[in-house]
Amino acid sequence: MDEIKEEFSFQIFLKIVINNKIIGSVRGYKEKDTCYIGRLIVHPDFQNQGIGIKLMVKIESIFKKVNRFELFIGIKSTKNLYLYQKLGYRPFKTEKLNENLYLTYLEKIIEI
């Protein structure tokens, strides 16, 4: 519980609610000139309806004074990779966590 309280102290959490149920969410925080985005989630019944894009556009607009956005996904998350690339994110690093888990890091640079 303390870990959750700590996350709420420095991160912005966004959610989309339909019929009193959270069907999508994303979080982000700023460190120096970078916004780190995490845990974009959309309920399976509501996927492919633009909700993920709406959440990403909104979180980016909240952190509009940064010059870089960064996030990571599992290397096998091709559907998520496509979504992020549509929004201007580009892979810049792959990290091996163990034999079965690789992460792809993506970034979006904002020209000021």
Walk through the language-model features, giving the residues of each.
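Acetyl-CoA-dependent GNAT
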Residues: 1-45, 56, 62, 95-97, ...
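Short acidic/polar active-site loop segments enriched in Thr and Asp
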Residues: 33, 67-69, 90
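Active-site acidic-Proline motif in GNAT/NAT acetyltransferases
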Residues: 43-45, 49, 76
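Accessory recognition modules or surfaces
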Residues: 53, 69, 103-111
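Conserved active-site alpha-helix within GNAT-family acetyltransferase domains
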Residues: 53-54, 61, 76-94
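Conserved GNAT acetyl-CoA-binding A-motif
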Residues: 56, 62-74
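Conserved beta-strand-loop-alpha-helix junction that forms the acyl-donor binding cleft
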Residues: 70-81, 97-101
